[in-house]
Swiss-Prot record:
This is U4-theraphotoxin-Hhn1a. The lineage of its organism: Eukaryota, Metazoa, Ecdysozoa, Arthropoda, Chelicerata. InterPro entries: Hwtx-2-like (IPR012625). It is found in: Secreted. Pfam families: Toxin_20. Keywords: Disulfide bond, Neurotoxin, Postsynaptic neurotoxin, Secreted, Signal, Toxin.
Length: 85
């Protein structure tokens, strides 16, 4: 009985803390809304495209064969750009 009561009170406390934290983030405008574009991920995508093509161009200028830079995290370098696999 005591264990069940402790578990219920712990869950209630966690729920209250989680809800309070979510309300604070929402008030600060840091929570994403459904359908809202993820600008940070878009910026990462642009960085990956730029990073791969610049790396390849630098290697070409050095009179070397262009070795495409490896893209990590589910990305592949193709035509001097990192593309999602």
């Amino acid at each position: 009985m005591k264990v069940t009561l402790i578990a219920i009170l712990t869950c209630a406390a966690v729920l209250v803390l989680h809800t309070t934290a979510a309300e604070e983030l929402e008030a600060e405008g840091q929570l994403m809304e459904v359908g809202m574009p993820d600008t940070e991920l878009a910026a990462v995508d642009e960085e990956r495209l730029f990073e791969c093509s610049v790396s390849c161009e630098i290697e070409k200028e050095g009179n070397k064969d262009c070795k495409k830079k490896k893209c990590k995290g589910g990305w592949k370098c193709k035509f001097n750009m990192c593309v999602k696999v």
